[in-house]
Amino acid sequence: MDSSDSSCQEWCSHGQYWLELGPTDLMERKGSLTLRSHHKKYSKPVLVYSWHRDRETYPKDYDIEGPEEVKKLCNSTYRRLGTSEPPVWISETREKMAQVCLNTKLAKIKSKALLNEETMNSGIIERDTGLPATGFGALFTRHSPDWSKMCTLTTYAEEYAPPYEYQPLGDPCQDDDYSIVHRKCRSQFTDLDGSKRVGINTWHDESGIYANSYVKRKLYSLTGGPIAPFLK
């Protein structure tokens, strides 16, 4: 029996056979496939590397095995945001991306405009190049004068043209004798209820100023009395 044990130890002493046997503490090593550990239970931390260590970012208030009698699972370490942190919270990604602005080598070159007061000169565009201004061979492409004719021309104006030329009647509102004095404006004191109030501000207006007040003061003299004269 002793001879067999000595031969086994001699056989295992060679380095090439150590990987075949494997470590002797495989069943007790933390992080092994058996997950045999005396101070840790199977939970979310075992899914990552170094699961047997206490994670710093793990919410301490979410520990269901804590000493508190009443568990508050809705609380977490993120409750401290807004108290010990600055008022404007900046994410870690934004903080790392802002390092580009601090490094002068990575700073972007200011873009320069192609057209400015110096480069924009009408003489450059309107110079005589010896080429036709429009049409084939022109340096700058331009639309023909009747380019927008298709947009303004309608079927009615094209097919139903008037057979004779005539002078259309002018707008009566453009006459010099036209006035809005005779129009009755909506009273601000008697016509209170109604849906014809214009504008955004629809509250009761008691200013006494109407749309034709300026025209009435211009047409009627203020010394003639309160009764307006009859106009023929």
From Swiss-Prot:
Keywords: Cell membrane, Cell projection, Cilium, Cytoplasm, Cytoskeleton, Flagellum, Glycoprotein, Membrane, Transmembrane, Transmembrane helix. It is a single-pass membrane protein. The chain crosses the membrane at residues 97-115. Residues 1-96 are extracellular. Residues 153-163 are annotated as: Mn. Expressed in trachea multiciliated cells. GO terms for biological process: flagellated sperm motility. One of its GO terms (cellular component) is axonemal A tubule inner sheath. Pfam families: CFAP95 (PF15139). Microtubule inner protein component of sperm flagellar doublet microtubules. Interacts with MYH9. Interacts with MYH10. This is Cilia- and flagella-associated protein 95. It comes from Bos taurus (Bovine). The gene is CFAP95.
